[in-house]
Amino acid sequence: FLAGGFHLVRNPAAGLGLLGTGAWLYLAVAFSEELLFRGYLFQRLEKALGRWRTQWLVALLFAAVHWGNPGMTGSTRILASLSIAMAGLLLGLCYLRTRSLALPIGLHLGWNWAQGTLLGFGVSGIPNGGWWTPVFHGQPEWLTGGAFGLEASLPCALVGAVACLALARGLGGGNPANRIMGNSIK
């Protein structure tokens, strides 16, 4: 796309029903994962470990849960784990900013739906027949994410890191990078 790694072709077989079905599917995924990770687990661990240690632990567990997904091997595992952990940090920051699961659920739903149902990429290794279909141009997987999905790309990990830094601003004073790295644990 931006680096010439792929272009999108409209999928003529995809009707409007696909967009609604995908939304319901990814709502179920987002709701269940956020209820487990940011709802139950995060809130229980935060009392014992503090918010930043909990933030890192839950983000790493969130990434590890995806290790059994199709295509999660070799170099894909490294970049996908990094991006999924960044997503876990971002979703945790959304929870910390609002103290509500609505924003993490909405962001999680929106990302998965846009990536899979709308753009046709794999979502965490699960193939999708989307409204559009990505056609890859032989660029390396670390650039495009390949069949695994955008989470297996370096650009996704970098965007996740920038989003985390932006959202961490205002959560407890000091440098946002220090807060994310746990240097000012509260």
PLM feature spans:
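Membrane-interface helix/loop boundary segments of multi-pass membrane proteins
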Residues: S32-L57, P70, G74, L93-L101
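Hydrophobic alpha-helical transmembrane segments
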Residues: L19-G20, W52-L57, S81-L82, A102-G106, ...
